[in-house]
């Protein structure tokens, strides 16, 4: 029984440790890229405007983040698509 509790609580702290580690990594990526939260929000709004010309998207569920390591930073966007717009729709 004690072994079960140790494994159970050991996994919990390990999981919390990994979450904290990932959050710190994301903070460092944003810091190294010198990107403010305001710029990321502005970029997200611009992406919504452009992509909405071609697709109906769930803009409330859209996620934009920066990811990377010591050598490079990547922009990662998760954009839920509800449906594609017809090809003959006017594009501005």
Curated annotation (Swiss-Prot):
Pfam families: MinE
Keywords from the UniProt entry: Cell cycle, Cell division
GO biological process per UniProt: cell division; regulation of division septum assembly
Cell cycle as UniProt keyword: yes
Tagged with keyword Cell cycle: yes
InterPro entries recorded: MinE, MinE_sf
Annotated family: Belongs to the MinE family.
NCBIfam families: minE, PRK00296.1
Protein task: Prevents the cell division inhibition by proteins MinC and MinD at internal division sites while permitting inhibition at polar sites. This ensures cell division at the proper site by restricting the formation of a division septum at the midpoint of the long axis of the cell.
Protein name (database record): Cell division topological specificity factor
């Amino acid at each position: 029984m004690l072994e079960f509790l140790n494994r159970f609580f050991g996994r919990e702290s390990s999981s919390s440790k990994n979450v904290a580690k990932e959050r710190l990594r994301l903070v460092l990526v944003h810091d190294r890229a010198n990107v403010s939260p305001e710029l990321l929000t502005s970029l997200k709004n611009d992406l919504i405007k452009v992509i909405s010309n071609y697709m109906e998207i769930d803009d409330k569920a859209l996620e934009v983040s920066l990811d990377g390591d010591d050598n490079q930073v990547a922009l990662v966007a998760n954009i839920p698509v509800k449906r594609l717009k017809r090809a003959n729709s006017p594009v501005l």
